[in-house]
């Protein structure tokens, strides 16, 4: 039987000059220290593009192996792996939201991104095996195409043999040009893997390289800390979490998806997910992404700048009282918008139609009015539960129409008001997971000054897959996360 390992991946902050210092610590882990570079507002664009491009659009042992990882804007975590014999080094994003491993190929001749990053040369590897199957992966802001090959992958000093991966011969996105990473190492389920290539954790499992069939993330969100965090294959480091993990079963294989409950603002329900929403834990997403109807309420609660929607204000002004009266009369909320004439079908459409239809003036029409109406129903129904007066309810809905999240995802807040902002909490497995303002507000530099942005962005997915939350690095920074592929479950515990 092959020797089983606990593979530790140590994450550190980005350095323009990466002076590497390797040493074995008292706990048996081999760690890598990196210098760090303080980032500014200009880096947000690159991080945002990387985050958008990184979304795939598809229906305890004494042994340790170190890999230096980089924390880019506290949002993208990536590190160096080796490919081939002898190893050719590549910087890759460790992404739980996709499943393929790909790197630029030496046969990539016509994409600028390839010339700006390391390229894999099969002629220099004695362990290379040809495959040749062509493939293409489409992302949120571009695509890569190429062909499959097989070779050994070095993660730390652990060798995964004959891993199937993609040699990218074309990269059609500015994301890949400006990104500080060469490729992506997907950690999702094989169900979303292009070409049925096994994700690397599955190969580790089949080759009996792991102490346990799990991997775990600890992301250090402290911008002043020397370490960016740890990714551990085969176990979890008890120094990086407090108490026991709360586990939830994977509800749908592909992404690391589970059934989540409500989002609470200062202990009060936002209503939209009161009966449950799907959620995905995704290390490749920078922020927290969720339904527009909820993010608008979050924006209002924290004083974030937003987009004023004339369609929204029109619906509240002309139909708000009618919606309110129907809800008071116990009308099924899914039928309210069709009864007031703004939606064609009962419950056939959802707020999850896309934020563009709500705030983009160039996309007016019945779709926009229906989407706004459905949001208004959620807001008004939620306020009725709080026993608010009619005047307060309609005034609140009108205020939310001025706080709709920007389509580009960035919502600025006052840095001086952070201490006065409410706690937010996700309900998972009937337990509340609190995020403090210090945890969900992201600080960055712009012209020597600190700028604060909300960690929440609008991201609408229509039924049947939605509504959907994506819990990215903002959430994973607060909660140590275990991905248990042996038992198909996800665990959360407060980060230490």
From Swiss-Prot:
Residues the record marks as active site: 95, 282
UniProt cross-references to Pfam families, sorted A to Z: Asp, SapB_1, SapB_2
GO cellular component, one term: vacuole
SS bonds (residue pairs): 108-114, 273-277, 312-401, 337-373, 343-370, 415-452
SUPFAM superfamilies tied to this protein: Acid proteases, Saposin
Major localization listed first in the record, in broad terms: other
Keywords: Aspartyl protease, Disulfide bond, Glycoprotein, Hydrolase, Protease, Signal, Vacuole, Zymogen
SMART domains for this protein: SapB
Saposin B-type domain mapped to chain residues: 307-407
GO molecular function, one term: aspartic-type endopeptidase activity
EC number: 3.4.23.-
Glycan attachment residues as annotated in the record: 387
Presence of the UniProt keyword Signal in the record: yes
Signal sequence annotation: 1-24
All residue ranges annotated as the Peptidase A1 domain in the record: 77-493
Function text: Involved in the breakdown of propeptides of storage proteins in protein-storage vacuoles.
Protein name, per record: Aspartic proteinase
């Amino acid at each position: 039987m092959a020797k089983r390992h606990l593979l530790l991946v140590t994450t550190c902050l980005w350095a323009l000059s990466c002076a590497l210092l390797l040493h074995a610590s008292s706990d048996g882990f081999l760690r890598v220290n990196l210098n760090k570079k303080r980032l500014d507002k200009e880096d947000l664009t690159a991080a945002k593009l990387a985050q958008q491009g990184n979304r795939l659009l598809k229906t305890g042992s004494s042994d340790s192996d170190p890999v230096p990882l980089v924390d880019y804007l506290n949002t993208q975590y990536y590190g160096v792996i080796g490919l081939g014999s002898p190893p050719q080094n590549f910087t890759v994003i460790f992404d739980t939201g996709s499943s393929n491993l790909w790197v630029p190929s030496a046969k990539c001749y016509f994409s600028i991104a390839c010339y700006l990053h390391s390229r894999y040369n099969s002629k220099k590897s004695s362990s290379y095996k040809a495959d040749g199957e062509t493939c293409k992966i489409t992302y949120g802001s571009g695509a890569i195409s190429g062909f499959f090959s097989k070779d050994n992958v070095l993660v730390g000093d652990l060798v995964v043999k004959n891993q199937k991966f993609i040699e990218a011969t074309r990269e059609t996105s500015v994301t890949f040009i400006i990104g500080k990473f060469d490729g992506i190492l997907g950690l999702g389920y094989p169900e979303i893997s292009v070409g049925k290539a096994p994700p690397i954790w599955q190969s580790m499992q089949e080759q009996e390289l792991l102490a346990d069939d799990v991997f775990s993330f600890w992301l250090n969100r402290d911008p002043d800390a020397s370490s960016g965090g740890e990714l551990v294959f085969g176990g979890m480091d008890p120094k990086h979490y407090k108490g026991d993990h709360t586990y939830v079963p994977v509800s749908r294989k592909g992404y690391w998806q589970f059934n989540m409950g409500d989002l609470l603002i200062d202990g009060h329900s936002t209503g939209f997910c009161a009966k449950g929403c799907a959620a995905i834990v995704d290390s490749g997403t920078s922020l927290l992404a969720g339904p527009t109807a909820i993010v608008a309420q979050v924006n209002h609660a924290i004083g974030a700048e937003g987009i004023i929607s004339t369609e929204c204000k029109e619906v509240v002004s002309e139909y708000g009282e009618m919606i309110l009266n129907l809800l008071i009369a116990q009308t099924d909320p899914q039928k309210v918008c069709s009864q007031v004439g703004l939606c064609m079908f009962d419950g056939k459409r959802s707020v999850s139609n896309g934020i563009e239809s709500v705030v983009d003036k160039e996309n007016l029409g019945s779709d926009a009015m229906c989407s706004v109406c459905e949001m208004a129903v959620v807001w008004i129904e939620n306020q009725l539960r709080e026993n608010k007066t009619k005047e307060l309810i309609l005034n609140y809905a009108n205020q939310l129409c001025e706080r709709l999240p920007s389509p580009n995802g960035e919502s600025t807040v006052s840095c001086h008001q952070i201490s006065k902002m409410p706690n937010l909490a996700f309900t998972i497995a009937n337990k509340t997971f609190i995020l403090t303002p210090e945890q969900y507000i992201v600080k960055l530099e712009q012209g020597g000054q600190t700028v604060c942005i909300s960690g929440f962005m609008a991201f609408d997915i229509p039924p049947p897959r939605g509504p959907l939350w994506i819990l990215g690095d903002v959430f994973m920074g607060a909660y140590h996360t275990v991905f248990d592929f042996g038992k198909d479950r996800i665990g959360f515990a407060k980060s230490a």
